[in-house]
């Protein structure tokens, strides 16, 4: 199980590095420790960011919303409250990168409770809440990861 999460975290960060090398959004990116709720911190000029990364096997036009787990949303917002790092939720899709600055949402996220099959825990998992972010609140870059794909 730990290997599954380790591999995903490494691939998430690799995607972020490659995307940033092409788009130059950040001056620096620093990974957070393993199993932290936040994947990385980043800087651009005088701005600092807390970054959560997610990879989704879907095209950008499949849904009008993208979900975030409630604990990740709350952790990013607490990070902003206590450190001033702007909360970014970065989603790598099949054909695009969708970036939400959670401080700049124009519409309140909807909440849902749902059951999912967890690949990491290999069982049906009950989640208390997920927030659904309106894709219109995001900045979207057309981009495709060139070097590797998730399995």
What are these model-predicted stretches?
Residues 1-34:
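Acidic-basic catalytic patches of nuclease active cores, encompassing PD-(D/E)XK
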């Amino acid at each position: 199980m730990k290997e599954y999460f380790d591999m995903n975290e490494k691939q998430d960060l690799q995607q972020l590095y490659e995307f940033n090398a092409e788009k130059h959004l950040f001056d620096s990116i620093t990974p957070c420790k393993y199993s932290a709720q936040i994947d990385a911190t980043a800087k651009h000029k005088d701005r600092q960011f807390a970054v959560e990364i997610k990879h989704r096997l879907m095209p950008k036009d499949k849904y009008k919303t993208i979900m975030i787990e409630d604990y990740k949303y709350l952790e990013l917002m607490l990070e902003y409250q206590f450190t001033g790092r702007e909360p970014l939720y970065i989603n790598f899709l099949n054909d695009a990168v969708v970036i939400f600055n959670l401080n700049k949402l124009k519409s309140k996220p909807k909440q849902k409770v749902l059951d999912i099959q967890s690949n990491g825990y290999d069982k049906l998992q009950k989640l208390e809440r997920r927030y659904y972010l309106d894709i219109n609140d995001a900045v979207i870059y057309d981009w495709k990861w060139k070097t590797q794909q998730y399995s």
